Amino acid sequence: MLLDDKMKVSVAVPVFEYYGRGVEVLDDMLRTISIQTLKEVEVVISDHSINNDIENYCQKNEYGLNIRYIRNVDGRGNPAINTNNAIDNCTGEIIKVFQQDDFLYDTEALEKMYTIMTESNAKWYACGCIHTRDDGHSFFNEMYPNWHDRMILDPGFNFIGGVSVLSIKKEVKTRFDPNVRMCLDVDFYYDAKVKYGMPILHHDVLIANRVRDSDTLMSEVSEEETLEEFKYCHQKHGIVK
């Protein structure tokens, strides 16, 4: 399928080798995009991989999707840089941000999101999500997005969810900060709220998040590093605790 300039939704996907499962988890996501009721969709893939596995997979395009593949050598290993690159290359009216290992839970997910956003003056949006430990064979812990002012103040108050619940209108200029990892989502949410107002908080489960027992970001970042990230965000945004 050819890319064109009439995309309603762009799905921005930063990818890497993902511990040897990069193609496998990306395939799950693309499969769920291929069965969406909304068809005017492009998938923008920004690839931090060193090998060619994902590029070769995208070239096959087995689901016949509008795929825009970009090999990204800048800031390799930094999720913010890779995500921003995917967003910056999107052409759709609405940009749906997606972590590589997550996937759509509802075949009408993109259509619901697009309709709600285009009928609202709000510039950004978060939906509900559900979790899986076994690659979608079973699900648990539905989560619905809610705003909490302590989100940017202290760890443990992100009641919106991870970045895969996020969608923005194309005119939104907020981007992810390359200087943070644990605060990547809450820093973006706070900045977007300051610049664009409250998001649409859509209490419908549209996204499935994979939960990994090992190799998680939380195991890679110490509590001290997390607290330092929050201090950095406070200084950046002029927040006094």
List each language-model region with its residue ranges.
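Acidic donor-diphosphate engagement hotspot in glycosyltransferases and nucleotidyltransferases
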Residues: V25, I54, D106-K112, G136, ...
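Short beta-strand-to-loop acidic/aromatic patch adjacent to the donor-nucleotide binding site
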Residues: G92-F103
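C-terminal, non-catalytic tails of nucleotide-sugar-dependent glycosyltransferases
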Residues: M1, T216, S222-K241
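Short, well-formed alpha-helical segments that are part of the catalytic scaffolds
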Residues: Y18-I35
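Conserved donor NDP-sugar-binding/catalytic core segment of glycosyltransferases
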Residues: E108-F139
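Conserved nucleotide-sugar donor-binding catalytic segment
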Residues: A12-V13, N146-T226
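Glycine-rich, basic loop-to-helix element that forms the pyrophosphate-binding segment
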Residues: V73-C90
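Acidic donor-binding segment of Leloir-type glycosyltransferases
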Residues: L30-D74
